[in-house]
């Protein structure tokens, strides 16, 4: 139990936020600084920019519309301004990504999507996780992508990833 930093109510509160759900919903302007600080802290830990940059070369690849300063990276961590030009640090010839096999049925695929229920094992899913994201969900179950973004590794080409598919790979989830 924690005490809300806004209303003082004592209840179950996310430690990183310090404010209760009621205040986030009913007093958003007061809660916003706490939420923003938590987001910044979650990115700072991995050496990522804390918010989309606003001064520099404009990147239009996502909703963040970063303006990336010379020698810096955008919010995603895989676009950089080098000598006044936007450069892809990953994603063209090789993506920052990890993969693994997940036996079907798996929690990332609705049961009706795969025939594992009909044909059973050894069918599997090829689960692919990209090492960059334009969101910053505080409690993302796949938070470790931030480490991949920081180090721009591991990298894998489309051909290498495609080679992981075999006769028992029923689907691919990203």
Predicted regions and their residues:
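Short metal-coordination and nucleic-acid-contact micro-motifs, chiefly zinc-binding Cys/His arrays
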Residues: 1-3, 16, 55-58, 72, ...
């Amino acid at each position: 139990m924690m005490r809300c930093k806004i209303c003082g109510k004592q209840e179950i509160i996310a430690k990183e936020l310090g404010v209760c759900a009621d205040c986030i919903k009913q007093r958003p302007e007061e809660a916003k600084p706490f939420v923003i600080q938590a987001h910044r802290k979650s990115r700072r830990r991995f050496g990522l920019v804390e918010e989309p940059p606003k001064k520099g070369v404009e990147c239009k690849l996502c909703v963040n519309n970063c303006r990336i300063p010379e020698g810096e990276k955008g919010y995603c961590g895989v676009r950089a301004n080098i000598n006044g030009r936007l450069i892809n640090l990953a994603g063209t010839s090789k993506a920052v990504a990890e993969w693994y096999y997940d036996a079907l049925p798996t929690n990332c695929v609705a049961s009706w999507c795969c025939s594992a229920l009909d044909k059973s094992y050894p069918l599997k899913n090829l689960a692919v996780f990209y090492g960059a994201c334009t969101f910053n969900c505080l409690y993302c179950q796949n938070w470790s992508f931030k480490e991949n973004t920081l180090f721009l590794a591991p990298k894998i080409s489309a051909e290498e990833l495609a080679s992981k598919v075999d006769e028992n790979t029923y689907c691919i989830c990203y």
